[in-house]
Amino acid sequence: MGLLECCARCLIGAPFASLVATGLCFFGVALFCGCGHEALTGTEQLIETYFSKNYQDYEFLIDVIHGFQYFIYGTAAFFFLYGALLLAEGFYTTGAVRQIFGDYRTTICGKGLSATVTGGPKGRGARGPQRAHSWQRVCHCLGKWLGHPDKFVGITYVLTIIWLLVFACSAVPVYIYFNTWTTCQSIGNPTKTSASIGTLCADARMYGILPWNAFPGKVCGSNLLSICKTSEFQMTFHLFIAAFVGAAATLVSLVTFIIATTYNFAVLRLMGRGTKF
């Protein structure tokens, strides 16, 4: 078999949907977690500097921000592991589907994964059998999961519903910063609005960011315009937009995972007549 023919058969058997979804998932999660973390830090600095001088006014806000940042850490770790499992599931089920259709039976990765799941070669040496036995138990557990794509369909479906809420929440700070930026544009171009510049304000209390007794709690007129021109505000605004885009990319990847996994499961169940693999 020539090199080109071998590469062509590998490409034919590759689960392209799972590969694209995994890459999109890792990209989206990295963008959401990295930019979201820095955007929350920038928001904390803006509140402390311009909207309130009393620590008690934004003490609860800081706790909430830190809680979201810890959530981001957990999200990054979880999606890294789950994305790798979904990619392995894609190789595993795609090999079985190719076998049913009589195509190239499995990919090189699928063969390696199958060998790993079945235990692989035995260990050597005094501690070899013990290590091999422990590794076989882990692989056996992994094989049970990879052999049941319906579990991945259910988990990914629930995860997609949860991520829809995360996606909606990531749009809230973008909306707040966009309103503030629009107000600054009106202040910078007085001819575009009939209101006086002094009445154009950004009130953090209105969005529930600060309590109503916070002072000053809002910034108006030329002071607000000067804030919008700072690098901190512009950077934080763009970071929230990037985090929103990352959340959208992650949502698309999860939907792609659902479609690919559901298709493989349906083919294996209907055309494979329920054969376990």
Curated annotation (Swiss-Prot):
Residues making up the signal peptide according to the UniProt record: none
Q: Where in the cell is it found?
A: Cell membrane
Q: According to its record, how does it sit in the membrane?
A: Multi-pass membrane protein
Task: Provide Extracellular-side residue ranges.
Answer: 37-59, 179-238
Enumerate the UniProt keywords alphabetically: Cell membrane, Disulfide bond, Lipoprotein, Membrane, Palmitate, Transmembrane, Transmembrane helix
Q: Where is the lipid attached (O-palmitoyl threonine)?
A: 199
One GO BP on record is:
central nervous system myelination
Q: Where is the lipid attached (S-palmitoyl cysteine)?
A: 6-7, 10, 109, 139, 141
Which pairs of positions does the record mark as disulfide bonds? 184-228, 201-220
Q: Mind telling me what this protein is named?
A: Myelin proteolipid protein
| Gene name in the database record | PLP1
